[in-house]
Swiss-Prot record:
Native species: Cupriavidus metallidurans (strain ATCC 43123 / DSM 2839 / NBRC 102507 / CH34) (Ralstonia metallidurans)
UniProt GO MF annotations: acyl-phosphate glycerol-3-phosphate acyltransferase activity
Role summary: Catalyzes the transfer of an acyl group from acyl-phosphate (acyl-PO(4)) to glycerol-3-phosphate (G3P) to form lysophosphatidic acid (LPA). This enzyme utilizes acyl-phosphate as fatty acyl donor, but not acyl-CoA or acyl-ACP.
Catalyzed chemical reaction(s): an acyl phosphate + sn-glycerol 3-phosphate = a 1-acyl-sn-glycero-3-phosphate + phosphate
Compartments, as annotated in UniProt: Cell inner membrane
Identification of the protein by name: Glycerol-3-phosphate acyltransferase
Taxon lineage: Bacteria, Pseudomonadati, Pseudomonadota, Betaproteobacteria, Burkholderiales
PANTHER family: GLYCEROL-3-PHOSPHATE ACYLTRANSFERASE-RELATED, INNER MEMBRANE PROTEIN YGIH
Length: 202
């Protein structure tokens, strides 16, 4: 029961959409109303406001990081076990994808997933981030970098820790992240996906 309680709290944390919050605070349009319609840092950047995009990126990553770290450090004292920590990781990610506060219209989860991975294991997070940076540098597609990183993340974890409940949670997160990039996959295959640095009008 305590595992589920912590998972619910994590979901509520994940439901805070920093793209929406930052946009409101900085007087920008609702990120659902322009570009890809995705409430994430990449879409916010299409307004031309780099600070807003950076704040969005940091906020989305920090909520994933904070939810898992808090559960890891304080949860055991209340009876939260490894299954509970895995549920928290999955729940905060689901909160980002389907936010309660924003009519369940959430983002794709790249930054939040990164925060979760760093909280689980800094080496895992760094390895996955390095994968993203390498793919992004050579191919200039943010979406492709995210997809490849999502594929490798579960393997990195298993190589380091073996197969356990957290490996299952990371696998589910990766599958969900890939599923959220369906439109990007179609554009990549059609050669129509935007490269990093290309600007789109809001």
């Amino acid at each position: 029961m305590i595992n589920l309680l912590f998972a619910v709290i994590a979901y509520l944390i994940g439901s805070v959409s920093f793209a929406v919050v930052v946009s409101k605070v900085m007087g920008l349009p609702d990120p659902h109303s322009y570009g890809s319609g995705n409430p994430g840092a990449t879409n916010v950047l299409r307004t031309g406001n780099k600070k807003a995009a950076i704040f969005t990126l940091i906020g989305d990553a920090l909520k994933g990081l904070a939810a898992v770290l808090l559960a890891k450090h304080f949860g055991p004292a209340y009876g939260v076990d490894e299954t509970g920590i895995a549920l928290v990781a999955l729940a905060v990610f689901l909160g980002h994808l389907f936010p309660l506060y924003h009519r369940f219209a959430g983002g794709k989860g790249v930054a939040t997933a990164a925060g979760i991975l760093f909280a689980i294991d800094p080496i895992l997070g760094a390895g996955t981030l390095a994968t993203w940076l390498i793919i992004a540098f050579f191919f200039r597609y943010s979406s492709l970098a995210a997809l490849i990183s999502a594929i490798f993340a579960p393997f990195f974890y298993v190589l380091m820790n073996g197969v356990d409940i957290m490996a299952g949670a990371i696998l589910v997160i990766s599958v969900l992240l890939i599923a959220r990039h369906r439109a990007n996959i179609a554009k990549l295959l059609a050669g129509k996906e935007s490269r990093i640095g290309e600007k789109k009008k809001v």
